[in-house]
Amino acid sequence: MSDLYAHRESDEYLLKPEHFAEKKNRPKRWDCLRPIIYTSLAFVGFIEILFFGIFFAQATRKTPERLLGELNGLVGNFPARRVIFRSDPLAASDHKTEESRNATMNNWLSYMPRGNGFIAVNQTERYTLPPPIKQLGQDTYSIAVFHQLHCLYAIMSVYDDLAAAKSAADLNAHHSRDDTHSNEHPHEQVHVHSHDHVDHCFQYLRQSLLCCGDTALEGQDPRTDNPGTDGTGAVHICKDFDGILAWADSRRLVDAKHN
């Protein structure tokens, strides 16, 4: 190859060879963006996996059963509230006068809704329930707390009768949830306060106390210096009873109520 040809060949380069070397060594824009893009895609993928994982967990998780609530969700959900146990002078009679007994009865009635806490439930076969109470042409059930109150009042009423030395005839005049009271309101019932009924109330209330399992801490009885407690002054975490009472009253079967 002649020197002239070699010179000519080199002159045909539009750019000097050094320019290509610089361009080859310069990092491309894609090389700079690649880590950012990969990181972003990985982050989006992680978020999607997390989202679907949470969604799947929520879809398959069973709703937790509310403490002391109704298993099937047929009764409203009532909030918990702090309640200080206080003495109520009308909670028990003086065991002497009819006036005092009537005042106590009315005091207890204030905790009972109209209809005594019986409600109607449709399509009972869809739920986990015991056989319904057939009354007023409907399938009905008793809300437990009002049955419990009724039982406790029944025991106290018998105690009043014994304390006042009532006759056996008078013992047959009290109302209960066990026997038919009238054709108009078959859910209102009359019962002779026999041993069977009182024994039932003792057992039922014991079961209710065991179910509630109240673990509030109770302190010294303020009425005496002797070691002991009457339960007053302790703070308990309770359901909103006013809410329960209003809920039951709004779904009553009849307007009458009794202890």
Curated annotation (Swiss-Prot):
A motif (HXXHC 2) lies at residues 197-201. GO terms for cellular component: membrane. Pathway: Mycotoxin biosynthesis. Disruption phenotype: Decreases the production of ustiloxin B. InterPro entries: UstYa-like (IPR021765). The 2 HXXHC motifs are conserved in ustYa family proteins and might form active sites. This is Oxidase ustYb. The lineage of its organism: Eukaryota, Fungi, Dikarya, Ascomycota, Pezizomycotina.
